[in-house]
Amino acid sequence: MTAPTAPTLDVEALRTAPESTFALAAVLAEDVEWIDVDQRTQPRSPAVLHGREAVLEMIADAESRGITSRVTDGFAAGDRAALTVTCSYAGGGQVLCNALLDLRDGNIVRWFGVQAWDD
């Protein structure tokens, strides 16, 4: 007899969703911790958001500025996952983010992303 498996993140559903950011928002835990590091928010002082509402506000702000986001690659295994997210600005600039995720019951409880921006 095998032990029941815990739900994991459905990366393929995120990757193929017409609006990846909406699909991603649906799998954020209420107590999610979202950490991003890039050239402006360097490792000693990363950008940190606490809670689902704070992350949703950040996503809404990006969308209000015409930024589109797509999950372009990733995998999940048990309570861990990794995603590649590509964001595009209306003017053609792009941001690439690779993130490691901690999961609980298939929802994201911790996001640690490293971003690279077009100059």
Q: PLM features: what roles do these ranges have?
A:
Residues 1-7, 40-46, 99:
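Charged, low-complexity, helix/coiled-coil-prone segments
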Residues 2-3, 57-119:
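A beta-strand edge to alpha-helix "cap/lid" segment located at domain peripheries
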Residues 2-33:
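Short acidic-aromatic low-complexity motifs
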Residues 4-5, 35, 39, 80-81:
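General secondary-structure edge motif
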Residues 13, 47-50, 89:
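Residues that cap or flank secondary-structure elements
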Residues 22, 27-72:
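A solvent-exposed, acidic/Ser-Thr-rich amphipathic alpha-helical stretch
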